[in-house]
Amino acid sequence: MSKFLVKAPAKINLFLHILGKNSNYHSLESLLVFVNIYDILEVTIDAPRSGVYFTNLKINRYNNTITKVIYLLSQHSTSSVNVFVSVIKNILVSAGLAGGSADAAAVMRLLGNVWDIQPQVLEELALEIGSDVPACLHSKTLFARGRGEDILLLPDLCLPKYIVIVAPKGKPLSTVKVFNNYEPSAFSSPICDNLPVRQDDWLELIYNARNDLLDTALKFVPEIEEILFVLRKFRNCLIARMTGSGATCFALFNELSDAEVVVRELQMTRPDWIVFNAKIL
């Protein structure tokens, strides 16, 4: 029996554009970063039994992204041992932060290494779990398109590091619900053929971009609009935007001191919001 401790970082979509839809999936373009908010997973290989335990008891222990990973990877391994995963949930659930995908990717990385499964196989299997899982396998700044499987890593992109994350308490928002109700008057035009080369051009793109799912998310959680309005009023806020399918929002800052001012004020004045600092990895 072997035990491993792994971390799964939360994801932020700096922008999210929807380009179209086929019979099953939406096609998208998104710039993703990962931040220092982690779920902590204890993975026991060759355990007495297989299973998953979450500190957040609202998550289905028997049908979730981790159980799917264990099943899929066991089909590509000669190992037939039990795997048990205990998860300390720090990433908000159903909040646009890809907590389930991050957990799945963390387990995939570990089991792929222990069971000697090729990275290309892991990337193919990741998409079977969810559209954010391929990006979460990398957990680095990247540009994703398609369903999320077409990934361009951006190791040299230097972004503002400090993020204030705000979510309305008790307002989880299902990704499936938002996408199923997304009915745009027109889809966004692709930018993938003309991606920026210079640092300043990337920053300009980020500032002028958007989250195409915002209007749909507002139908279910109108409070998102107030959160964004409040964040944008703070000094030196570069952008304020919703991440993923919501309802979590973020504000981006160059200086930690500016972000700390926002967190202190909102934690004192808005007990109905979850507010905390984060840093881009």
UniProtKB/Swiss-Prot annotation:
Pathway per the UniProt entry: Isoprenoid biosynthesis; isopentenyl diphosphate biosynthesis via DXP pathway; isopentenyl diphosphate from 1-deoxy-D-xylulose 5-phosphate: step 3/6
Catalytic residues (UniProt): K11, D132
Keyword Nucleotide-binding assigned: yes
TM ranges: none
A Gene Ontology BP annotation from the UniProt entry: terpenoid biosynthetic process
Catalytic activity: 4-CDP-2-C-methyl-D-erythritol + ATP = 4-CDP-2-C-methyl-D-erythritol 2-phosphate + ADP + H(+)
One Pfam family it belongs to: GHMP_kinases_C
Top EC class of this enzyme: transferase
Record carries keyword ATP-binding: yes
Enzyme Commission code: 2.7.1.148
InterPro entries in UniProt: GHMP_kinase_C_dom, GHMP_kinase_C_sf, GHMP_kinase_N_dom, IspE, Ribosomal_Su5_D2-typ_SF, Ribsml_uS5_D2-typ_fold_subgr
Annotated keywords: ATP-binding, Isoprene biosynthesis, Kinase, Nucleotide-binding, Transferase
Entry superkingdom: Bacteria
A molecular-function term among this protein's GO annotations: ATP binding
PANTHER family found in the cross-reference section: 4-DIPHOSPHOCYTIDYL-2-C-METHYL-D-ERYTHRITOL KINASE, CHLOROPLASTIC
Job description of the protein: Catalyzes the phosphorylation of the position 2 hydroxy group of 4-diphosphocytidyl-2C-methyl-D-erythritol.
Family, as annotated: Belongs to the GHMP kinase family. IspE subfamily.
Protein name: 4-diphosphocytidyl-2-C-methyl-D-erythritol kinase
Annotated source species: Ehrlichia ruminantium (strain Welgevonden)
